[in-house]
Amino acid sequence: MSQVSICLLSEAGADPGALSILAERWGLVSDEQSIMALVLTPERLELRKRDEPKLGGIYVDFVAGTLAHRRKFGGGRGEAVAKAVGIKKGYLPRVVDATAGLGRDAFVLAALGCHVQMLERNPVVAALLDDGLRRGYQDAEIGPWLRERLTLLHASSLTALAEIEPRPEVVYLDPMYPHRQKSALVKKEMRVFQSLVGADEDADGLLAPARALATKRVVVKRPDYAEPLAGIAAQAAVTTKSHRFDLYMPLL
């Protein structure tokens, strides 16, 4: 993985030595001119857009906030993502989430009992995920099962999908796509994320290796207005008001 330049900041009360360890681990080079900043606070690691401070920080939190609410009060196995990967009574597929992002869908699947391996190639996003996992693993309530079911591999999906063993039943893809939704959360996250990583220009190339790896199905999450990944029509789909989960059979 090549090095990435980003402004690295440590707030008062945070361990000052932790930032240099983090930079070395993830191949980050501090650039004080960068508009993107990775900020170590006493509580967590955050990504901030320095020229738009009102956007606040983006961070991964598996313990509290929206994911905790979704785990406790969401649709459970009735959630569209659960239906899409094929969760049924007595069947919990092993899943590779090849475009992990902030890990939301991966966490939902892990909370339902699936073993999920997240792949994330961007070192800044991987660092945020790793920080969220570390705090989640330490939590008394979710830590025991989270450690067992949700893991992270910092790698390019294009290469990792050809090397993962054993083969999972499901490969899950949610490549970044320009959002039309105007919700505050989506706007904030998309603006910060697209400033950091840009669009997934090579996303079309993920479908074939994903279908070669999965033993049961590939699930591709798309906005309802988006064309199929790689222009290949899905064999089935699970739809919601704003998204669809396109389903593809493996390439045997």
Curated annotation (Swiss-Prot):
It is an enzyme of class 2 (transferase). It is found in: Cytoplasm. S-adenosyl-L-methionine binds at residues 104-105, 120-121, 156-157, 174. Signal peptide: none annotated. InterPro entries: 16SrRNA_methylTrfase_J (IPR007536), SAM-dependent_MTases_sf (IPR029063). Keywords: Cytoplasm, Methyltransferase, rRNA processing, S-adenosyl-L-methionine, Transferase. It catalyses: guanosine(1516) in 16S rRNA + S-adenosyl-L-methionine = N(2)-methylguanosine(1516) in 16S rRNA + S-adenosyl-L-homocysteine + H(+). Its EC number is 2.1.1.242. Pfam families: SAM_MT. One of its GO terms (molecular function) is rRNA (guanine-N2-)-methyltransferase activity. The keyword Ribonucleoprotein does not apply. GO terms for cellular component: cytoplasm. SUPFAM superfamilies: S-adenosyl-L-methionine-dependent methyltransferases. Specifically methylates the guanosine in position 1516 of 16S rRNA. Belongs to the methyltransferase superfamily. RsmJ family. This is Ribosomal RNA small subunit methyltransferase J. It comes from Yersinia enterocolitica serotype O:8 / biotype 1B (strain NCTC 13174 / 8081).
